[in-house]
Amino acid sequence: MALGFLTTHVLDTARGCPAADLSISLFRIDGASRHHIRTMQTNADGRTDSPILPQAEIAVGVYELVFAAGDYLRVCGYDADSLFLDDVPVRFGLTDADQHYHVPLLLSPFGYSTYRGS
């Protein structure tokens, strides 16, 4: 069994807090096809309660996390008619099934940043 897994952490940089109750969907990309694996919610710390892709399921390949930023921002009180961001897709490759991959998202109403964390 592979030893790696995939996690995330979402921070609301405009409010200076974790982005709680934000929906995240994980897809595996196979050529032109996109296969839904699961959808999870962030907890009060802006993390998921378990890995988005656990050890038993991780495999080398291309994946996409889709962060439901628009829904989250509307719940936070931002005007739905003036929102700049909606779904935020982050596509990345996993090249070693024995590594821990961490994909943080720093989110604000008008921009976001991501990187490979540790």
Residue ranges of model-derived segments:
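A short acidic/small-residue loop/turn micro-motif
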Residues: 26, 44, 56-57
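Short Pro-Gly-centered beta-turn/loop motif in secreted/extracellular proteins
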Residues: 50-61
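Short, acidic Ser/Thr/Gly-rich low-complexity loop/linker segments typical of extracellular
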Residues: 33-49
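Feature of secretome-associated and extracellular-like proteins
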Residues: 60-118
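Beta-strand-rich interaction surfaces with strong enrichment in secreted/lumenal proteins
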Residues: 37-41, 53-55, 79-80, 90-93
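Solvent-exposed strand-loop boundary residues in beta-sheet-rich modules
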Residues: 14, 30-32, 71
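Beta-strand signatures of extracellular beta-sandwich domains
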Residues: 23-27, 64-66
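Beta-strand-rich domain onsets/edges
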Residues: 1-20, 28
